[in-house]
């Protein structure tokens, strides 16, 4: 069985994702496509613009057969941990092939991943405070493999390859050339495929839904029509300000990835910042990327500590969000062989455990923003 896996955020689901899904179907044939998707919080350190259930439905309608949630402990992380979580979950769920979009599908990702995975860990630790960690890491990669990997999707593809190599290469890697606008490009109205960032900006700036029809599926547009609030950092900024002003330095030092005195910088600059974008500019330095600072801001807002994240890895599970008829058949046949707990219903007991426990806790704030329960009382969506 040639089960194909995809790691995604679908923030939101757009025509570029649909293109990749079609490419995955060419590989899978009649076998299932499994998508492991970020939940209500995404890698760049912010709330998803649409809840996980709506995005999962769009993925099934576009051709996926099963959508599982990538736990918060992996989803809101730098590329290496994000990729590790995605590849590990897909492997445990029986996937044999990983399809992902990149700027140049001719690159030998399996070879690159194998080379980089063999680099001793101490050579991946950098002390140049005039550059970000990611810049120094990319420079090291270029030296090791003789090829500069700088495009955002290629960097993520390389992270998948390294994660796969570290796990013993359980998945065949199938990179696919992206089409349309780049990862963080500004709006290109003539493009058939628009970047998710540009689409989010359109939505947050009040674009007419008719303006989005060429880039978003009808089901996704209908979901946005039902939303009263689109989550974003400017909406959350007052809560972050309260959190930073009310917490002690000692409390902030317990926050996941709070290091090198950033707790003092955060606490000092929050008083002066007019909004979240201004706050990020004030705390930005050559040492940290904006994504790193957004993630740290999110951990702070949600009071996610180092202990919370480390303890969550003691019991890793994944929530089933949506499935097709083909997906249901696959689950029935293969579930007993999965090397991971599948959560179809959140209850008082499992809501206290591992990755699910942290996920349920952080979703509480998302629920307050959008006004809808995200875990308790929800069951996987069957989409035909």
UniProtKB/Swiss-Prot annotation:
Organism in which the protein naturally occurs: Lactobacillus delbrueckii subsp. bulgaricus (strain ATCC BAA-365 / Lb-18)
One BP annotation, GO: tRNA modification
Compartments where located: Cytoplasm
Reaction catalysed by this enzyme: cytidine(34) in elongator tRNA(Met) + acetate + ATP = N(4)-acetylcytidine(34) in elongator tRNA(Met) + AMP + diphosphate
Family to which the UniProt record says this protein belongs: Belongs to the TmcAL family.
CC terms in the record's Gene Ontology section: cytoplasm
Function: Catalyzes the formation of N(4)-acetylcytidine (ac(4)C) at the wobble position of elongator tRNA(Met), using acetate and ATP as substrates. First activates an acetate ion to form acetyladenylate (Ac-AMP) and then transfers the acetyl group to tRNA to form ac(4)C34.
The protein's Enzyme Commission number: 6.3.4.-
SUPFAM superfamilies given in the database record: Nucleotidylyl transferase
NCBIfam families: PRK13670.1
Encoding gene (name): tmcAL
Keyword DNA damage: no
A Pfam family annotated for this UniProt entry: HIGH_NTase1
Name of this chain's protein: tRNA(Met) cytidine acetate ligase
Tree of life domain: Bacteria
Binding site for ATP: 7-20, 101, 153, 178
Primary localization: cytoplasm
Gene3D superfamilies: HUPs
